[in-house]
């Protein structure tokens, strides 16, 4: 099977479907995150998005202010709908990086920087800029992914 889109990867690599679960991925990376129905532990800006989104492109994602004092409301899905989760909001550059596997390690091959002019639209970037691939120290479990 030729893997072009996320739905192809879902079918081709069932052992790695956890990667499509963005809540699980966020928690594995140590981010402050939780599912709809679980209150935040810190007041601040969060990204709210579907737990699963095989369409990609940030569909359904939006920036939202969440407050620890909204505990009861959040427990009753007043701010986060079922099937969605919240995760701490990150600032800084947005990279899209292609990796290749070399000697059982994932190394960056190509990269672009996505430019947003506003946080109001998380689906599309205003433009992309090709850059030299940045190097990030990936968690050990990432290198165990063998596709």
Per-range role (PLM):
Residues 7-142:
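Active-site nucleotide/adenylate-binding loops and adjacent lid/helix of ATP-dependent enzymes
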Residues 1-6:
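General N-terminal leader/first-domain-start detector
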Residues 143-147:
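Long, well-ordered mid-to-C-terminal structural blocks that present hydrophobic/aromatic surfaces
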